[in-house]
Amino acid sequence: MEYNKNGQILREFYARHDLTDCFERDNAYLESAFDEINRIWFDNLCKIDEVNYLMIAEAPLWGKSKSYIYNPATPFTQFFQKSDLEYVLNTKIRDKAEFIDRCNQIGLLIIDISPFALNTEDTIINYRGKSKQNPYGITKREYRLLIQETLPTFFDCKIEK
């Protein structure tokens, strides 16, 4: 899976919002995050014998800590808590590595809907709503449009795998 088409969509998004001055810096981070996240995701996909359940997620915040559901070296995220899986499986789970293992064993695959690991630290735009305190947040409409534009170049490619 290549970043280039997604990067072009993002370049156009930044241009529409008069943020071209910030694009190169943000894009360098986003492309690097994209590559690492997808490497981890594909490595994990190979550990699932058969996909029985599909969970669609927004996108990881990633950042310096490399926070991601499939990264065993990072803490659990708000997105999917260990206690949720423990409840469903009626069992105790020791740590994140075991959590990922259990997801793989039951055939649970998590797919991000967006290729962009936007956050308030590494990118000028972010997934938080636009407000006076957060002028570079994107509105729900802008978010939907960005997702819609990247569906064929990102999400659909993962579904086909």
Feature locations, PLM:
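A polyanion-binding, active-site-adjacent surface
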Residues: 2-161
